[in-house]
Amino acid sequence: MNLRGTRFAARDFEIRTFGLRNSGAEHATEVNVSGLAGFPLAKTAASFSRRKPRDWHDMAFALPHNDSGGTTAAIASARERFIGEMAALQTALDDLQANFQDSDARGSRAYVTQMRIDHPELNPEMLAADAVIAVEEFCRGVRNSAN
């Protein structure tokens, strides 16, 4: 259970409209999705408490691949939205960073494993390096705002 992280996701969401066509009829629905600040902070807590490879993958994927400007935008959003609250995540941030300390760390391997399933043509060494850099940059950026 991830009770520490859910508060970040619950307090930072946006409404997105998704459409589909079914039997020739257009349908649209609005869905609450976690925002750029809430998602990585919730995933940081989830990675620490659940230790599931999917959480590590999601974290490393969402940082550079979000629609708002990559890891730098995620850091800025988290710092702006949750200033003064990230000190509570310091242990989880330390743990996240340790799980991406190099290309052979558990988080890096989890990211590469899933990305190779989804995109077998991608170079595993480059994937691991991308994950290490993104997570390091995020941890350093949000940690600096907590001090």
Label the predicted regions.
Residues 1-147:
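Compositionally biased terminal segments of proteins
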